[in-house]
A protein has these predicted regions:
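Non-transmembrane, aqueous-exposed alpha-helical and coiled segments at domain scale
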Residues: 1-240
Length: 240
C-alpha cells in the first residue's frame, strides 16, 4: 500500500505466532529440486526392507524438497501422534523413520550408504487418512476439515509443525496417483488439487498445479504465508 508492503492483517498460520497480511507464494516448477526428477526412482511406490527385517511400501518424491513417504498404519501408528509421543516410546518411532530416511537417501543417490546419509536430506514423512485429533495447543482438528494427516522429522526430533517445502512435496505426492500418500488423501483433494495438510500444530493449505500429459509434472505450488520486518540497518558503501 502506497509503495510499501502491507504487514498488518488477520491471517494466521498454525504453528506461527501472531497474525499478518496474507501473502500467497508460488513455487514455479518445483519438481526435481535436487534429483532432477519428480519421481527419483521412476516409481510411484518402492519396497524397502527395514533393519528389523520388515518390508514396507514407500514413495520417493522430489518437489521443492525431496522426501520419502510411508503410511503410519504400515508402521503400526495412527498417524496423529504428537512430538511428545517420541519422549516415551524409547526412540522406536524416530529410529524407524531414520531407518527409512537413510535407505531413501541411498535410493535417491544422495549417499553411497545409509551411514553416509546427510541428516537433513531427504526428509521422511509419515502420512495417514483424514481423522479427528487434538493438536499440540489443545484445539480439536476435525477430520472433515482436512485432506491428509502428516508427521515429519526435523533432524533428530519430530517437527512441531510442518515446513513449507516439505508441505509442497507432501501435497504433490498426495495428488500423484498410486503413491502411498495418494492412497490416504481425501477424494476432495484429488478433485480440486487443493490440499489441507494436518500437522501437530494445526493445518496447512496448499494449491498444486499438476499435469500428467506425458508424465507427472508440477507447474507450480501455492501456499499462503505472512511477513514481518525483522531488522533495519544501514549499509555503508565506500565511494571512489
Amino acid at each position: 500500500r502506497d509503495g510499501k508492503p502491507v504487514i498488518a492483517g488477520d491471517f494466521a498460520i498454525d504453528g506461527v505466532p501472531g497474525t499478518g497480511a496474507r501473502i500467497t507464494l508460488y513455487f514455479l516448477e518445483p519438481g526435481g529440486s535436487k534429483t532432477g526428477k519428480l519421481l527419483p526412482t521412476g516409481n510411484v511406490q518402492d519396497t524397502i526392507t527395514l533393519s528389523d527385517g520388515r518390508t514396507i511400501q514407500v514413495s520417493l518424491v522430489d518437489a521443492a524438497n525431496p522426501a520419502v513417504f510411508v503410511k503410519a498404519t504400515d508402521l503400526g501408528y495412527e498417524g496423529t501422534e504428537l512430538p511428545a509421543f517420541t519422549e516415551t516410546d524409547g526412540g522406536v518411532l524416530l529410529n524407524t523413520l531414520e531407518d527409512i530416511r537413510t535407505t531413501a537417501a541411498v535410493m535417491m543417490g544422495f549417499a553411497p550408504s545409509k551411514e553416509a546419509a546427510s541428516p537433513a536430506v531427504p526428509k521422511v514423512c509419515m502420512v495417514s487418512a483424514p481423522q479427528t485429533y487434538v493438536a499440540s495447543d489443545g484445539r480439536t482438528i476435525k477430520g472433515n476439515s482436512i485432506d491428509i494427516v502428516a508427521r515429519t522429522k526435523a533432524l533428530a526430533v519430530m517437527h512441531k509443525a510442518y515446513a513449507v517445502t516439505g508441505g509442497i512435496c507432501t501435497a504433490t505426492a498426495a495428488l500423484i496417483t498410486g503413491t502411498v500418500a495418494n492412497e490416504v488423501v481425501s477424494e476432495r483433494a484429488k478433485e480440486t488439487n487443493q490440499v489441507t495438510l494436518a500437522h501437530p500444530s494445526g493445518k496447512f493449505d496448499f494449491e498444486i498445479c499438476l499435469t500428467n500429459d506425458t508424465g507427472w509434472h508440477v507447474e507450480k505450488a501455492g501456499v499462503a504465508r505472512t511477513a514481518r520486518p525483522i531488522m533495519k540497518g544501514i549499509a555503508y558503501v565506500k565511494g571512489e
